[in-house]
Amino acid sequence: MLIADCLELMGFSDFYGNADVIHRLRDMLARNRFPHAVILAGPAGSGKYTLSLMLAKAMNCLSPILTEDLPDFCSKCSNCVRIAQAEDLDTRFTEAIEAREGLRETDKKETRLFVQTHPDVLVIPPDPPQMMIKVDQVRRVIETIYFRPGEAKERVYIFSDSAFMKEAANSLLKVLEEPPEFATIFLLADNPGALLPTIRSRSMICSLAALPAQEVEQYLAKYRPDWNSKQRALVARLSEGAVGRARSFDLAAYTAARSHALTILGSALRNIDHSELFKVTETYRAGAEGREKTEKLLRTLYSLLQDLTFLNSGTPELVRNTDIQADLKKLAESSDFNWIAFVSDRLNDVERGMRRNLLRSLSLDAFATAVEQEVPNR
């Protein structure tokens, strides 16, 4: 999934959390010892993309400043302003897809997705429908990286995902073996282990840690005053320490999906009337909107299963859906670890079915029937 923390960034002081990591990166900039390839690792919403753009600004700011005796950017010069236009990655990504859809069919197949709001800063997102970095995208990097920047001090390339097709990953290795002195490559990875070992060995890995829930709540108190304290506490736990994810969290959509998830699990565990279950599954239709809705439901089901695991293992303090803990306890009383593992496997089956374009409502009905048959002591 592609999410950017769309802040009006004024400097490194606006990056929330991971102060030691930011200090180390800025110190390397100050000493002109910044590596040519950096893997920014951390969970979705931890600020990897935001930080990569901040560093691109700091490298290329026309009126650089010092804060805390370390390099910072002005946010006002032409380079900073143009780089900032790439901050809303979701919107830029959608625009790129729409632009490609407007091409002739023969041109569509040969056109790869890029986001570029500054001539010397190129963002390379995963290319649909596989949502992976493709070899033609890496070839574009190879074609341009050895030319000196035209309007900036440093060419910057940002791969917004670590999912590379095999040929693309091998092509990237060639660049990493002999990078030019005036170019920097950022690889953003939820899991750096997904990258080839040879790519990792040629890059500096910089990890952004998840923040404590209390810090995320403090952040939300400032940036989401429309939420009450209980809502902020819930989102802080659900976002797993990622402030970008927390700030953009769609609470209404999540609670709607959670209501459906509870109906599905409750139907299986409590052996109740299935009419409500079928009313729920019938709403998951074909098409892009239905696919997104189903993906949210599956993520929510996984979240509830994790909470059931915490309750069954005697660690209720780890439960994330704290506002429905009473409902979860009732479900936990009827479940065990084997059943939870079985349900997780069946969710994987639904996901595989989605990739084969199976009818979602029927897949969910089959899922609910299967998990009911495995309920303990029935």
Name each region found by the language model.
Residues 2-167:
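Clamp-loader machinery-focused feature within the broader ASCE/P-loop NTPase space
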Residues 146, 170-187:
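Conserved catalytic/switch belt of AAA+ P-loop NTPases
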Residues 7, 11-71, 82, 181-184, ...:
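Charged, glycine-rich active-site and insertion segments that engage polyanionic ligands
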